[in-house]
Amino acid sequence: MKLLSYLDNGAVQPGLYVDGDVYGLSSLCNSIRDMLDQHGSSLGFIEKAHADGNLPLVGNFDNLHIKPPLSPRKLLSVAGNFVAHIEEGGGKLQPEHTQAPWIFCVPPTKLMVGHREEIQLIPESRKIDYEGELAVVMGRTAKKVSANEAANYVAGYTIYNDVSERTPFMIEHVNEPRQLSFWYTKSFDTFGPTGPFLTTADEIADPQDLTIRVEVSGEERQNCSTQQMIFTVYQLIEFLTKFLTLEPGDIITTGTPAGVGSTTGKFLQAGDTVRISIDNLGTLENPVVRT
């Protein structure tokens, strides 16, 4: 099952995607996150409502303004989770890389964009990079969950583009220059396009057997299997829930493979279009514009 959010008369509405068409879910919930809060991963009632003809047809997917599937309370990201990505940056896999994942947070309240919405380059943007990533959406409250149990807490999966400013912005701090963190360089408005769907977990037999493909203006830049992750989806959930409680709708982005612009020198330019495809999750497409 593929869930999404779309814009209707200025309001974001929840929907169900079926064979190119979108059916409204507003009679069942206010939002996709609201639905997860109420029902967790037990979403079979949506399919039943559709089968019974109780969901109104909103329109064709291609004709709707698609927004990110949901707004998470927490957006947690993993850096350096593919060996080839570490090595392309000049590093080597070290013992510490396999002991614990490198987690960072970006504000979930930033202006996130959905499928076909613009990635906007502001005047300060200099070296803007793309990062195609598998994102995990939690379906249940999770605390101290083992990797073996983690699948039971996942609502589904979506596509995330961890757009990043690579210019080493420096600020003055106590008479000593200090480079700004991931929190800043990955948190510009419109960075982090997400979607187009929340594909429910029952449609993904193995999250470690998916291929991530990224094209920029028709040129393939990334192509790698999630088999190459250092930490699996379920291991990441186990690690994170040792320290914090994950809630329904929280998103974990699981890292990007090799092929990013910071190593190839091919950064995003106004006029580009970024297309990220992941098996069974669809394609997330965003144009790049200069504001």
Which residues are covered by each model-predicted region?
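Structural signature of FAD isoalloxazine-binding scaffolds in flavoprotein oxidoreductases
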Residues: 94-113, 130, 270-280
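Catalytic-pocket segment enriched in acidic/His residues
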Residues: 8-9, 45-50, 59-65, 69, ...
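Short beta-strand-to-turn element immediately C-terminal to the catalytic PLP-Schiff-base lysine
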Residues: 6, 16-18, 25, 105, ...
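Non-heme Fe(II) oxygenase catalytic core, chiefly the N-lobe of the double-stranded beta-helix
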Residues: 109-168
